[in-house]
Regions:
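Mid-to-C-terminal alpha-helical segments outside catalytic/metal-binding sites
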Residues: 2-74, 98, 102, 106-107, ...
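Alpha-helical scaffolding within the catalytic cores
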Residues: 62-67, 92-95, 115-123, 149-154, ...
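Short, well-ordered coil/turn segments that N-cap beta-strands
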Residues: 74-79, 104-108, 127-134, 161-164, ...
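Histidine-centered divalent metal-coordination motifs
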Residues: 77-86, 208, 268
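Divalent metal-dependent hydrolysis catalytic cores, especially in the metallo-beta-lactamase
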Residues: 78-83, 95-117, 131-138, 164-165, ...
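Acidic-and-aromatic substrate-binding clefts and catalytic sites of carbohydrate-active enzymes
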Residues: 85-93, 108-118, 140-149, 176, ...
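H/E-rich (His + Asp/Glu) clusters that bind or coordinate divalent metals
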Residues: 89-90, 240, 246-254, 259-384
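Active-site gating/metal-coordination segments in enzymes
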Residues: 118-235, 287
Length: 384
């Protein structure tokens, strides 16, 4: 009996040592190579490799020999319909004006996210006539009993000071609360006086609603934007604290229909760059809505055939935008996406992080469509 226990103990120890040995990938590799070497299918050489690799460290260099058209500057003048300036974006007026000259940007729409003094200050600082400034609602008033009246008064003042339109950010619909503590819905009736004033003054509303749908899902191995979300966990809306993605989209639809005389620009392709059938429905059912491509060519370039068909169908309702200051590196990627048929290239500049592990394909749009997207559609919308 004693010998039997000793035998089992030794056997168990050997098994555990084998398992411990096999835990390490390099040891498993040695066994495989030894096996195939004995079979005559391997030289027996054990290559050097890292046992583990973080997804953020995985930056493969493709062996695919890419064709590069070397098309970096747009073929036509550009109106940047979704630009940002100021301290957060590390810009200065002289630098921006020079970039507009160098990059053939005819007008630059600066979408401010605050109204009142902040709007007046940046408008005064960036006074190049090619820069058109949008204001925003003073949401810091919204929890006050007379907050809507204060927002309306500030908005009127900003319009008198030259604001060409209104920018609404994603906190509207996701986070903002009314005085009673309830979430402020996109189609909330308490905002009617404000939107009625926008309609009366015939101003444009550029609205950023929600974020990519992946931001509403768990940050785990199934999320293709995992790398982006672990870098920016504050962008995650996968919580009961926030409404669901579809709920916000439905509220936005009601808002668009509630104010049919207001011209809306649904920014970031309406957050439907990954679902073109929904983008098609959005434009079909809301003739007062346009969309821009800002910060969504990463999604659009993944399905170029469908995207090209969509751009052809809706060529009068798509605006050019890059979601930031005027930058040559970023512009060159947008130009490559819109104008060439290059394949399998990066959608981000070398000095910027990627959103997910994929590449994009160019659309090779025709000259008439390019002109509309680059500048004609925005000129019509803003009556330039």
């Amino acid at each position: 009996m004693k010998n039997k226990k000793q035998t089992l103990l030794i056997f168990s120890l050997i098994c555990n040592l084998i398992l411990l040995f096999l835990i390490f990938p390099v040891n498993r590799a040695r066994i495989r190579i030894l096996f195939f070497s004995i079979m005559g299918y391997s030289s027996g050489n054990v290559p050097n490799f890292r046992d583990t690799l973080l997804v953020t460290e995985f930056k493969p260099k493709s062996q695919y020999k890419q064709t590069h058209s070397n098309k970096d500057i747009p073929s036509f003048p550009v109106i940047e319909s979704h630009g940002h300036l100021g301290l957060f974006f590390k810009t200065n007026p002289a630098q921006v004006s020079k970039a507009l000259d160098d990059l053939n940007i005819e007008y630059f729409i600066n979408l401010n996210t605050r109204g009142g003094k902040d709007f007046l200050d940046i408008k005064k600082e960036y006074n190049d006539k090619r820069i058109l400034h949008f204001t925003s609602f003073r949401w810091d008033y919204i929890k006050e009993a007379d907050g809507v009246s204060k927002i309306l008064a500030t908005l009127k003042s900003d319009f008198e000071a030259g604001a060409r339109g209104v920018k609404l950010w994603k906190n509207f619909g996701l986070e903002l609360k009314k005085p009673n503590g309830e979430r402020l819905r996109l189609d909330d009736e308490i905002l009617e006086p404000i939107f009625q004033e926008i309609e009366r003054q015939e101003k444009i509303v550029s609205i950023h609603t929600a974020d990519p749908e992946a931001f509403f899902y768990p940050i785990d191995e199934t999320n293709e934007r995992y790398e982006e979300l672990i870098r920016h966990p504050e962008w995650s809306f996968n919580s009961e604290v926030f409404p669901k993605f579809q709920e916000i989209m439905e509220e936005r639809e009601k808002m668009f229909k509630k104010y049919p005389k207001i011209k809306f620009v649904s920014l970031h392709f309406g957050e439907f760059a990954h679902r073109l059938e929904d983008a098609d429905r959005l434009l079909t059912t809301n003739p007062n809505v346009s969309i821009d491509i800002a910060a969504r060519i990463d999604e659009l370039g993944r399905h170029p055939i469908q995207t090209r068909e969509f751009f052809t169908k809706w060529q009068d309702r798509i605006l050019f935008g890059m979601d930031g200051p005027p930058e040559k590196e970023k512009l060159s990627i947008y130009v490559r996406f819109l104008e060439t048929q290059d394949e399998y290239f990066d959608y981000y500049p070398v000095n910027k992080p990627r959103k997910g592990i994929w590449k994009i394909y160019g659309l090779g749009l025709s000259t008439p469509i390019l002109k509309k997207i680059y500048y004609e559609n925005t000129k019509i919308l803003l009556k330039l």
